[in-house]
Amino acid sequence: MIQKKRIAVLGSTGSIGTQALEVVRSHREAFEVTVLVARRSTELLIAQALEFSPAVVVISDEAYYPEVRQALSHTSIEVMAGSEAIAEAVVRPDVDIVLTAMVGFSGLVPTLAAITAGKTIALSNKETLVVAGELIMSLATRHGARILPVDSEHSAIYQCLVGEEGNPLERILLTASGGPFRSYKRVEELEAVTVEAALRHPNWSMGAKVTIDSASLMNKGLEMIEARWLFDTPAESIEVLVHPQSIIHSMVEFADGSIKAQLGQPDMRLPISYALGLTERVSNDYPRLNFLEQTFTFERPNMELFPNLALAYRALELGGTAPCVLNAANEIAVEAFLAGKLGFRAMSTLIAQALEAHRPERSYDLQLLSELDAAVRAESRERLNHIR
């Protein structure tokens, strides 16, 4: 019997957040929502608040605070606004687990606050570990905070390592779907990619930013950096394999050559429920695998055609603040692509220019990372005027 977990959902109106609330809705005996956080999707946030009755609702964009406050004025729900309010909400004593499903750099500060308070983190915001992996893992150890990955690949690796304490890990095999353009062979094909085509992922239902990252293979690059810190494994021991079926979510090879893999339907509710249940499995009625209908294939990623993956390996090799630069430039690149201001293939050009211009700092703190993130974003927006 799972003890009831009290959850703060950061990014409740996004793809991961809404799927997490589906899990809660199906297992109200196991989970209780105490905090909901959204950026500006007020209509959905208000509906979620009325359904789940959290103690606190936070709208991070303060311009929408009056609307949310008015809509919930007849309830006992406390309504707060702004980034500081998010950090305040996650450390409440009635929060056991903080699901960090905010997109991008914005998830870093509340994650740090929750870790410092010793909370359990269900980590979906991979950018947090990309930008500040060494700092995050060090603080988690110091404050006794547990970090459980929500990304399907990292959840798979985590599950493969259960029961293997003390057994040397030789290699992580990080699987990738390859995205919607996996079969493309020429640069010209990628240069002609439209936003609509890039948003059509073949296997997964995700938010716009993650879907574009998946199409460009940057998502796998960010996940590689995340895996480096989560599992204390050097980049040279993390191999990316394209697995178009998205059934094998990742694998781990041990020193004796044995390999463990975690398989399942491409459904984010599975790793979400595993993390929220603190690795205790909750029953569900989701579709099951039929192995007689499956074919598993593997390919090497084409890092010449999709240079973002190579750029991620390069950023990790440079170390220090280089991954922060990679992340900031990528966020601007994706934003510009979605707005029709930058071509699909040109996103990697913008990111490469940001990395080339940066001299990594070996030691850093939150203030330095915040200042660097802002500076790289500004510089990248300026470079947009010179890239097509």
Q: Which positions does each model-derived feature cover?
A:
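Catalytic, metal-anchored helix/loop core of enzyme active sites in primary metabolism
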Residues: 1-388
